[in-house]
């Protein structure tokens, strides 16, 4: 099953990546410029799993005349900034709500060329083994961007840790918390 999932994701990445390259004509056997030089596609990605997926599909792209140049970023702001500045041809790391939020906040007009998987969220701790063990007043780290913060708060609500207002959606913030029985502190 893991191999099948990997192949599916690789195909998805390949499709999304090539969609940004334009359409080939029937006369073109590989992706090359007018002089026959292979096309270089510079893509920004976060390390896991996006960079790994791109490395997986890079040999297949090379067979089609596309040299994939991967630029790794360790935060979620720089890939979009680099793309908007023309330093990249594409990036691969975000879901559509994050892209829309980034465009709105930064006055950019970046567009999606294809859907990708959405990273799962979970609760992690080196000390606490279950939600019930969370101490009163404990600090819980949450993402610092609007869309992923909302996803994290919805996850916390689903585990009974907090209650959000009925109007809270994917862009929920700490202000949308209407019940916090154990007085948790949230740190973006």
Regions found by a protein language model. Give the residues of each.
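Beta->alpha turn/N-cap motifs
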Residues: 48, 75-76, 86-100
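A conserved helix-loop-strand patch within extracytoplasmic ligand-binding domains
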Residues: 113-162
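Sec-dependent bacterial lipoprotein signal peptides
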Residues: 1-19
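Bacterial lipoprotein signal-peptidase II cleavage site
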Residues: 18-32, 38
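Ligand-binding "clamshell"
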Residues: 101-113, 127-128
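Short, well-ordered beta-strand elements
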Residues: 36-48, 66-72, 139-140
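Alpha-to-beta junction loops
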Residues: 84-94, 138, 161, 182-185
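Short helix-initiation/N-cap motifs at beta->coil->alpha
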Residues: 71-81, 168-188
């Amino acid at each position: 099953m893991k191999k099948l999932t990997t192949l599916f994701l690789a195909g998805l990445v390949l499709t999304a990546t090539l969609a940004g390259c334009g359409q080939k004509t029937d006369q073109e056997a590989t992706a090359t410029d007018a002089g026959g030089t292979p096309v270089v596609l510079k893509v920004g990605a976060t390390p896991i799993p996006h960079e790994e997926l791109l490395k997986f599909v890079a040999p297949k792209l090379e067979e089609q005349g596309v040299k994939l140049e991967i630029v790794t970023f360790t935060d979620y702001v720089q890939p979009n900034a680099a793309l908007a500045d023309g330093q990249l041809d594409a990036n691969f790391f975000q879901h559509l709500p994050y892209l829309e939020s980034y465009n709105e906040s930064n006055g950019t007009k970046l567009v999606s060329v294809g859907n990708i998987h959405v990273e799962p969220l979970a609760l992690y701790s080196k000390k606490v083994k279950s939600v019930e063990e969370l101490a009163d007043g404990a600090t819980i780290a949450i993402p610092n961007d609007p869309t992923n913060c909302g996803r994290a708060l919805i996850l916390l609500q689903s585990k009974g840790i907090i209650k959000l207002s009925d109007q809270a959606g994917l862009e929920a913030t700490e202000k949308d918390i209407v019940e916090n029985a154990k007085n948790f502190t949230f740190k973006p």
